[in-house]
Regions:
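Short, small-residue alpha-helix embedded
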Residues: 15-16, 74-96, 100
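Short pre-catalytic strand/loop immediately N-terminal to key active-site residues, enriched for Gly-Thr
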Residues: 63-77
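Glycine-rich beta-alpha junction loops
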Residues: 13, 44-48, 69-72, 103-108
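Glycine-centered flexibility sites
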Residues: 44-45, 77-79, 93, 118-125
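Conserved phosphate/ATP/ADP-binding segment of small-molecule kinases
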Residues: 1-63, 94-97
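Charged C-terminal helix
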Residues: 97-150
Length: 150
């Protein structure tokens, strides 16, 4: 992990990797920064809105949150899809906020469509339009925190 450029842990995985108990957004940011990679994308992070979930992108200089509604009974594969979409955005040269918002919208939309069709796994082949042009509403905000000084 210290050699990685990007890490994409769930909140549970972040707690395990960092050896820290995480109860807040500030705890999440501190634990993510302690991991080492320049970008840590924490999925299933604490959200500000009720019945929502948050994807928190933590870098040495900034933190961006992307929140969307919870979808009960989410199929398997959401973390892998988030990591893949985030990597695709990096390779395309997009800025962090655009990558995060697009990745979160894609995963949220794919989950919602798959759940609607009672699928156990994400319906990637059937719902390809969500991969290319997601329409799901995701709110993004910059988190006011104390970034590390270079």
């Amino acid at each position: 992990l210290p050699l990685a450029d990007v890490a994409t842990p769930t909140l549970f995985e972040l707690q395990w990797m960092s050896g820290r108990r995480i109860d807040s957004e500030a705890d999440t940011i501190a634990a993510a920064r302690a991991l080492g990679p320049q970008r840590v994308l924490v999925t299933s992070a604490p959200a500000m809105r009720r019945n929502s979930t948050c994807n928190l992108l933590v870098t040495p200089r900034a933190t961006i949150a992307a929140e969307h509604g919870l979808v009960p009974n989410a199929p398997h594969g959401t973390g892998d899809l988030m990591a893949a979409m985030f990597t695709a955005g990096l390779l395309a040269g997009l800025d962090d906020e655009t990558i995060l918002k697009r990745s979160a919208a894609t995963v949220f939309e794919m989950v919602a469509r798959s759940v609607k069709r009672h699928a156990r796994d994400l319906l990637l082949a059937d719902e390809q339009s969500s991969l290319i042009n997601p329409m799901a509403l995701v709110s993004c905000r910059r988190v006011l925190d104390a970034p590390l000084r270079a």
